[in-house]
């Protein structure tokens, strides 16, 4: 177990300490072996009611063309994904509060579970309790909701303080998701302007105590149509791209050591930033050795995926390239198993169905 001093020393170090990397890799091999679970990700809409100051699909971004994928198109995507051998999918989109949207999600989850028998991860923001319960009942067993930054004071540096952006509701929703029975994924945004190492430590402490079944973290990458981008143009101090990349790898290693049995995602943002410095195989090898054991290739149609512009220069890769990049990074890509985390079975005392 890592002490506060050890964690702070790691975060302040210029590189990833060798002993941290060795311990994280040791824990990873014990609980996950060399397996990397692939989830086929589809971003069904870039419509969102929120206006987070760092996010490219914020409601106030009037320059962004909005889309909402049709049911028949998603059905075809699911069919193609199944042909490739996937057993797990992830569905993501902006936060929308409307009965029409809820019923579309119900229909989608029912299709994914009843027709294709997918294990389903969803990420659609802070939806109402009854909607979250019904989505779970229909077959969506995993939910990703990042808290972004755990300090309420810092949280409101990057969000309006209104009914759409409520820190307390965000945390309450995380607790609710776990109570409903979801495998809950959460995480922070690393290296935001106006944040410091001490803020990262608070984020780490929250995740350690919350014990999520999945950790989904990523480095902050600016998006030109956001308020934060304007601050950066004015020369506001920020962690460099290399620092944000290394900090993300350090946090992956820290979480692997602290949580042991949870799944940890090598996020698209991490890959986007990392491939500015290294080839894809090298980035994945580093992430997996630090403890990541999940990646999510994007299956959003090409005409839509660039519109899901959370940040600039997002890395896009076809299934085949990702699959072989995992193999070439000396790990084993897994499509035909659900890849449920051991933490979920331990907490619920269920028999293990990986």
Model-flagged regions — what are they?
Residues 1-15, 76, 82, 208-354:
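Auxiliary Fe-S-binding modules of radical SAM enzymes
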Residues 21-61, 66-90, 141:
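N-terminal pre-triad scaffold of radical SAM enzymes
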Residues 24, 52, 145, 177, ...:
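Conserved, mostly hydrophobic/aromatic
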Residues 42-44, 95-97, 124-128, 149-151, ...:
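Active-site-proximal loop/turn and secondary-structure-junction residues that shape catalytic pockets
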Residues 59-74, 81-105, 109, 113-174, ...:
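Core AdoMet radical
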